């Protein structure tokens, strides 16, 4: 899934689960793997891959700032969002003009059974996942 989907899912996980960070942080990484199993569309196979990656990163960074500064997300939710999204930074690194393009997270390896779908259905799948996470956040995030 795109970086933004992993970020919002991590926010929801950190907001919903009231457990130790020792449990929550590994759970956020596990959530990343589970979301990558769901059939979805990845921009990694398009000619415009760098622009999709830059846009995804910019949208995710802006979302993080808004959630931190204006929506009052807890530190746990913010941390869990970052941990869940962090493995996708190797996707961003892979589109930069660098020699090093190692994909270090297991769900990004060619041997991983990554869920795949066409562009329209795959984007809808991710939008649906984000919508579920936003609904969960609405139920679990304390009002300001």
Give the ranges of each region predicted by the language model.
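N-terminal membrane-targeting hydrophobic helices
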Residues: 1-144
């Amino acid at each position: 899934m795109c970086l933004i989907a992993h970020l919002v899912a991590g926010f929801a996980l950190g907001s919903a689960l009231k457990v130790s960070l020792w449990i929550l942080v590994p759970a956020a990484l596990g959530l990343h793997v589970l979301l990558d199993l769901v059939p979805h569309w990845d921009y990694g196979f398009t000619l415009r891959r760098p622009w999709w990656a830059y846009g995804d990163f910019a949208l995710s960074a802006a979302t993080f700032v808004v959630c931190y500064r204006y929506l009052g997300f807890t530190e746990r939710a913010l941390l869990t969002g970052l941990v869940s999204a962090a493995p996708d930074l190797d996707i961003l690194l892979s589109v930069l003009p660098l020699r090093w393009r190692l994909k270090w997270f297991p769900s990004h390896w060619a041997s991983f059974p990554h869920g795949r779908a066409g562009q329209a259905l795959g984007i809808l799948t991710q939008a649906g996942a984000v919508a579920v996470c936003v609904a969960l956040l609405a139920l679990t995030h304390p009002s300001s």
